[in-house]
Design a protein with these regions (language model features):
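Formylglycine-dependent sulfatase
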Residues: 15-159
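Bacterial Sec-dependent N-terminal signal peptides
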Residues: 1-20
Length: 159
């Protein structure tokens, strides 16, 4: 009899667990520091004329977690993205200096290399990337079909 009482509650328990998982939004912009947007004004104490007014970022920041002590492995975009997404020093990849250019070429992140995205997906998150990639792009194979890992991407549409 007690079991019959608890069975109808199971969906509510499952859904309450799902909603407890936080949403994660990671912003990364080239040449942007913590003091450049108003989202960190509470921390930097910069005056309004010293930063870009970003009300949407401010709202997201007020609802989430902010990092105030982050460091980059490089002053360049490609190695910084590689380090952030893989957790590895960028010089451990095949590219030892500078950045990757163009939209074709083999990806700098190996197909079997764990990334933030694979970690989040393993925990049931849906992942997406918008904007500059700069880590090597091999969207299509020579037969015109999407390359492994890009099957659900439609790269012909405007963002």
């Amino acid at each position: 009899m007690k079991l019959l009482f608890f069975l109808p509650l199971i969906p509510f328990l499952v859904f309450s667990q799902i909603s407890d998982r936080p949403n994660v939004v990671l912003f990364m912009a080239d040449d942007m520091g913590m003091g450049d947007t108003s989202a960190y004004q509470f921390y930097t104490k910069n005056s309004d004329d010293q930063q870009i007014h970003t009300p949407a970022m401010e709202k997201l920041a007020s609802m989430g977690m902010l990092f105030t002590d982050a460091h980059t492995p490089s002053s360049r975009c490609t190695p910084t993205r590689y380090g952030l997404l893989t957790g590895r020093y960028p010089w451990r990849a095949r590219m030892k200096h500078w950045v990757l250019f163009g939209v074709q070429g083999d990806p700098l992140i190996e197909e079997d290399r764990p990334t933030l995205a694979t970690l989040f997906r393993s925990q049931g998150y849906a992942t997406a990337m918008v904007g500059k990639w700069h880590l090597g792009l091999r969207y299509t194979q020579t037969n015109g079909k999407p390359a492994a890992g890009w099957e659900d991407a439609d790269l012909t549409k405007d963002v």
